[in-house]
């Protein structure tokens, strides 16, 4: 699978299977990449616009995670035209070695930064709802800035192996230039699989399994707290309760649906070097992997639309800003943006992971009714 432009940690499991007929769609996949590029640049650009148009006094701690997530997605989607071209040319890379290294590196920086930001937002929402008073200091704006900086540094460091090992070389028949992971500088041909499996499995653990476990834990306690609140308070019955809890479920499930197929198929294929899958199963994994990758990439353009769909306040803020610009008004709809910041964070957990961020410095956020305002009309 060395000529596969999707598995950025390599995937040559040295199997004896015949992959001669393997060929992902040269039309569908590039089209999806370009669609994600167009929607992702527009949507994430709008997210950044709405966040930074809000006055500094009105911003909440979650806003820095939201903006950071949009930056990560935006940084990634701008590389998609390169990968669309690579796929359309049947894995012939015309852009040189440096662009191969850099674009691959940005993909992994995005993956790590996105899931770390989503985890940070989930933890921020946990603090806002479950432990609002005792942990109020952790949700100050400055703490969010420091945490975000640390997350970006960690993401950049974790992606370094891609920058180091990614390279270009002629294919076996010499007709194409491939952009692939080359471990020859540190391993023999017989031990390269160990590097591939080690880096691939570790990226799945750090970039999916551990963050997803943390997010599930946060949402479990959030759901418990909300359910307990509804038992104690007289609220409008089960309809609002159902809606509030269903939004939380959507945040976690969407993250899993976008990224689990990619990580699962990648890990299974790489483990084929150790477990020796039957050829039919091995070829099946290779065939579905490009499409699993497409699903995970869609996450980078999906988050803004999920905000708009699930959060009327964010939708209203965007509409107000657009209308305001068209009419030439000078004011910034602070109230809409501020409301967006709170509810927005809940919707963002779609992507590479659920990001729930509420954040905010106000001590009165301790009450669950605040969360209800945030997530429910």
Swiss-Prot record:
GO molecular function term, any single one: mechanoreceptor activity
Renumbered residue ranges of the record's region Disordered: 334-377
Inducing or repressing factors: Up-regulated following myocardial infarction (MI) (at protein level).
Low complexity bias locations: 335-349
Topological region Extracellular: 1-28, 85-97, 163-196, 269-287
Entry-linked InterPro entries: Apelin_rcpt, CCR1-9-like, GPCR_Rhodpsn, GPCR_Rhodpsn_7TM
Site (described: Required for APELA and APLN/apelin-13 interaction and signaling): 83, 166
Function comment: G protein-coupled receptor for peptide hormones apelin (APLN) and apelin receptor early endogenous ligand (APELA), that plays a role in the regulation of normal cardiovascular function and fluid homeostasis. When acting as apelin receptor, activates both G(i) protein pathway that inhibits adenylate cyclase activity, and the beta-arrestin pathway leading to internalization of the receptor. APLNR/APJ receptor is also activated by mechanical strech in a G-protein-independent fashion to induce beta-arrestin signaling leading to cardiac hypertrophy.
Family named by the database record: Belongs to the G-protein coupled receptor 1 family.
Protein name: Apelin receptor
């Amino acid at each position: 699978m060395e000529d596969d432009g999707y598995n950025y940690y390599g995937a040559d499991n040295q199997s004896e299977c015949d992959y001669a007929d393997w060929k992902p769609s040269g039309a569908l996949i590039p089209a999806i990449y370009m669609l994600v590029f167009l929607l992702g640049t527009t949507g994430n650009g709008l997210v950044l616009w709405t966040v930074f148009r809000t006055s500094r006094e009105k911003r909440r701690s979650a806003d820095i995670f939201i903006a950071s997530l949009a930056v990560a997605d935006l940084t990634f989607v701008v590389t998609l035209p390169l990968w669309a071209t690579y796929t359309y040319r049947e894995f012939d890379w015309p852009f040189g070695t440096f662009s191969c290294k850099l674009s691959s590196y940005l993909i992994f920086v995005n993956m790590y930064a996105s899931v770390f930001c989503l985890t940070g937002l989930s933890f921020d929402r946990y603090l806002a709802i479950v432990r609002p008073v005792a942990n109020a200091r952790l949700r100050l704006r400055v703490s969010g800035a420091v945490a975000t900086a640390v997350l970006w540094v960690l993401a950049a460091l974790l992606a370094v192996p891609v920058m180091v090992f990614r390279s270009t070389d002629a294919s076996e028949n010499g007709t194409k230039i491939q952009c692939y992971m080359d471990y020859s500088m540190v391993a023999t041909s017989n031990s390269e699989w160990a590097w591939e499996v080690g880096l691939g499995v570790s990226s799945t653990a750090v970039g999916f399994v551990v963050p997803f476990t943390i997010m599930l834990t946060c949402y479990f306690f959030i759901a418990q707290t909300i359910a307990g609140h509804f038992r104690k308070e007289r609220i409008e019955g089960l309809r609002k309760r159902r809606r509030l809890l269903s939004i939380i479920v959507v945040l976690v499930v969407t993250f899993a649906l976008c990224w689990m197929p990619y990580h699962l198929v990648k890990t299974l294929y790489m483990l084929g070097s150790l477990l020796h899958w039957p050829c039919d199963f091995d070829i099946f994994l290779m065939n579905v992997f490009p499409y699993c990758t497409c699903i995970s990439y869609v996450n980078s353009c999906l988050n803004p639309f999920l905000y708009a769909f699930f959060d009327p306040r964010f939708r209203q803020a965007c509409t107000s800003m657009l209308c305001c610009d068209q009419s030439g008004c000078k004011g910034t709809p602070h109230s809409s943006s501020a409301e967006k910041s709170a509810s927005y964070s809940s919707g963002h957990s779609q992507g590479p992971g659920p990001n729930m961020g509420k954040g905010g410095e106000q001590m009165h956020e301790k009450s669950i009714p605040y969360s209800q305002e945030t997530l429910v009309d």
